[in-house]
Amino acid sequence: MQSTSKYNCDSDYIAGRNYNTKRTNGREELSTGLTNEETGVVNISDENNIFFKKNIDYVKGSRIGKYKLIKTLGKGSCAKVVQAEDCETGEYVAIKIIERTPKQLSDIRIYREALICSLFNHPHIIKLLDFFHTTEYFFLIFEYVDGQQLYDIILNKGYLDEDEARKYFRQIISAVDYSHRNSVVHRDLKIENILIDRNDNIKLIDFGLSNFYDADDLLGTFCGSLYFAAPELLLGTRYTGPEIDVWSLGVILYVMLVGKVPFDDENIHALQNKIKSCKFKFEKTISPEAQDLITNMILSSDARINLENVKKSKWTNLGYKNLTNNFMTLRKPIIEINKNILRALQAAMFFQFTDMERVLMQYLQICKGDKHSLEQTYWCKKPVVILYYLTMEKFNELNYKSIPIDIDTGMNTKSLIDITIEKQPIIIYNFVRFTNAKKNNNPYNLFFSRSVFEPEMEFLNMTKDVSLDSCNISEDENKKHNFPKIKQSIIKGLFKGIKIKNGDKDYVKNAIIKILLDLDITYEANEKSYFCSYSHSGVECHFKIDLYFNILLLEHYVVLNCLNRKKDNFKLVTELIKEKLEEIGDTSNYPENAI
């Protein structure tokens, strides 16, 4: 691959080149560097401490806890990665060493990476095995990958043929799809962060810039490598999350097939302007299908295709019978909250989510209502809910009640009030041990605890995925119930509502349902309101519709309330519905068989 002087390998993790799990006499050498089992603090000698500096190479005899260091695998701008041997098992691991800074934000990113990589269970995503810390360093112990970076493969070959690139790309989007479905956006996708193991399969690494995202909220942090960064990051606009990963995936595919980055310039400001323009050329002839896919991924955010369309594209599936497998389970509605799991998550995620119990209790009440309702699938995408599912999935169905590790081990109190930023590394250390306490060899995690999840629903007979796209509430199901109820009011709806000029309550409901069907808005009627989801041409919005009857004016009012922070999208949907209501007019213009 041709590269400019500015396009250098700067990964925090480099794959190892040699593979050997033969046990050495490391057990006899384990007399120093012992770990405090309650706090995760490793005792480091002054001599060994020198090695952990990013610019210092291997120092003979260095060790971290039970891990004997072998060699430096790579150095990045923020960390170094070393190969080490577990002196108890003889297995190799990769240890990411990050020097701690006074900035609290840097620590939070490390905590987040540790939590995500300890909870995720995907064949193409790197797994975190352990976590240690000192006052100066964090140590993230990952599984060891024998192989090389995708960067090195492209550099050696110049570019990849389309069949080879397609195989890697399908595995990459499988990993990214799994992340997105678990409400995590990577934000640093690039060829340096993709490893190819000795079996020619990929591993996605370095979740140091990742974050949880919510479709109802927006992110605003600039992250990642400039060459792979989406234009909205450079423009400083807020974003949901998955769309910036899709851009980066488009750049990765371009680099694999062409051998160059699509945007390049020695002047950083000129490079930024090129990226913002979204205009590039194909420097090498590739198939029309590949060109079409890349072109639709490297577009402005409002025109860019989503990951689902990438998965379904013609080029991605050439030669394959099925779409890529994201290795997601079908999650059942919960019927109770496991207090141990909740308490562990509250402690571990205290730096980001402070209302976990409230959110989970609200989700529990929704699950106790209609099974697989639109509202339940909507709430099931919330990061807090997903974190609960991910943690439960770490334990098999028989063992959740006897979870062996207390997340507060090493703390003087079990109260969340006692959690401080100083104690957070201890909590993260214990949480990683907590999630790895029960090893589960089943990569699919097919079954959940019958005591926590709905008992009467057998997994293998389930056909619905808990995604908003798969939940289509039929019109007949809604018409069976006389929902939502039209609430009588004097004030509500008068100022913010859309007035219905004529018609009784049946007419009003029929008009609303007709409009929702005409606009292809997925909806569900409950006792209080219509719960609605609209997604079209890049516009996505979740909202509810309440119906009121003013007892003084004898008029009906339709009130729309936005459920997320995408106000522009909500305004557009409101205008569409208002326009449709005006088109319908009074009852004389409304056909009796409209629905």
From Swiss-Prot:
Q: Which residues form the Protein kinase domain?
A: 67-316
Q: What intrachain disulfides are recorded?
A: none
Catalytic activity reported = L-seryl-[protein] + ATP = O-phospho-L-seryl-[protein] + ADP + H(+); L-threonyl-[protein] + ATP = O-phospho-L-threonyl-[protein] + ADP + H(+)
One GO biological process this protein is involved in is: microtubule cytoskeleton organization
Q: Please verify whether the record's keywords include Kinase.
A: yes
Q: Where in the cell is it found?
A: Cytoplasm; Cell membrane
Positions binding ATP in this chain are 73-81, 96
Q: Which residues are annotated as active site?
A: 188 (proton acceptor)
- By its UniProt entry, which Gene3D superfamilies does this protein fall under? Transferase(Phosphotransferase) domain 1
Chief localisation class: cytoplasm
The keyword Membrane belongs to this UniProt entry's keyword annotation: yes
* A GO MF label: protein serine/threonine kinase activity
Q: What does this protein do?
A: Serine/threonine protein kinase involved in regulation of exocytosis.
* Protein name listed in UniProt: Probable serine/threonine-protein kinase KIN1 homolog
Q: Which organism is it from?
A: Enterocytozoon bieneusi (strain H348) (Microsporidian parasite)
Its gene name is KIN1
